[in-house]
Regions:
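Exported/periplasmic ABC-transporter solute-binding proteins
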Residues: 24-67, 71-78, 87-95, 99-100, ...
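Phosphate-/polyanion-interacting regions in eukaryotic proteins
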Residues: 83
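Bacterial N-terminal signal peptides
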Residues: 9-19
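Bacterial N-terminal signal peptides that target proteins for export
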Residues: 1-11
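Absolute N-terminal positional cue centered near the fourth residue
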Residues: 3-4, 19-21
Length: 261
């Protein structure tokens, strides 16, 4: 990973020293898949710099599985920091589960298409080519989280293929779509590129056409019942510091500030 500049290192030290003075804390984080690749690289750096320990619980940003973050919080599970797709985090803020003033946008990710490693790659360079790729595929997989909801409830209908592909398209719960594609259980699969990139055994064809693309923002906030709020704030500050930028970009995401420009 690229070494942060002197200015970035200085900012990182300033961000991290303040909470460290209060003593090491154990921070409980609930996180969905989209930001996980960058998060996994960054958390050890944060722990070394502060002495804090981060415990991670994973779940989808939405959906019916018990592991989904909204369902965990609804049944009273504790958390300090919540990291998930932005509009789902907004829903938790409306429900009083996340502190509204604590929300910070971390990064943006685009939906991409993947095939099993070595398989032919369909042409998705235009809307019509993308449409034909969907019709030609023998099986299609999409996630049960934000990107999959967009595909199944809006995009497939908008381009006029829903009725023709609904019997061969499958919503995947509880594991990355890429793993299903890697096992050969789906010919093509869709998920944010940051969730596809860590999966072995697949080839990422590329993002879906810009005209059809939805860019998911991933955001962080403090849970309303956070027991380690100060340490949680320090973690969030680190995740949006210049020191975090290389890991975010390497995961296939766009740094939130850059994406807004």
């Amino acid at each position: 990973m690229r070494v942060p500049t002197i200015a970035a290192r200085g900012l990182l030290i300033g961000v991290l020293l303040l909470p460290a003075a209060a003593g090491a804390a154990e921070i409980k984080v609930m996180i969905s898949g989209g930001f996980s690749a960058a998060y996994q690289k960054l958390v050890p750096e944060f722990e070394r710099a502060t002495g804090h320990k981060v415990t991670t619980v994973r779940g989808a940003s939405m959906g019916e599985t018990p592991q989904a973050i909204p369902n965990r919080l609804a049944r009273g599970e504790d958390a300090d920091v919540v990291i998930m797709v932005g509009y789902a985090l907004g829903g938790l803020i409306e429900q009083g589960k996340v502190r509204p003033e604590s929300r910070v946008d971390l990064a943006w990710s685009r939906i991409a298409l993947a095939v099993r490693a070595g398989a032919p790659k369909p042409d998705i360079s235009s809307v019509e080519n993308f449409r034909q790729a969907l019709l030609a595929a023998k099986s299609i997989a999409y996630s049960d989280s934000a990107s999959g909801m967009y595909l199944s409830s809006e995009l497939f209908r908008r381009i006029g293929v829903y009725d023709r592909i609904k019997d061969k398209a499958r919503k995947i719960s509880g594991e990355p779509v890429g793993r299903v594609v890697a096992r050969g259980e789906a010919e093509i699969g869709f998920q944010p590129i940051s969730e596809l990139r860590p999966v072995e055994g697949i080839d990422i064809v590329g993002p879906i056409p810009d005209e059809l693309q939805i860019v998911n923002v991933f955001a962080a906030g403090l849970a309303s019942n956070a027991k380690e709020a100060d340490a949680g704030k320090a973690l969030i500050a680190f995740l949006v510091s210049p020191a975090a930028r290389p890991a975010i970009l390497a995961s296939g995401m766009e740094f939130a500030d850059a994406a807004r420009k």
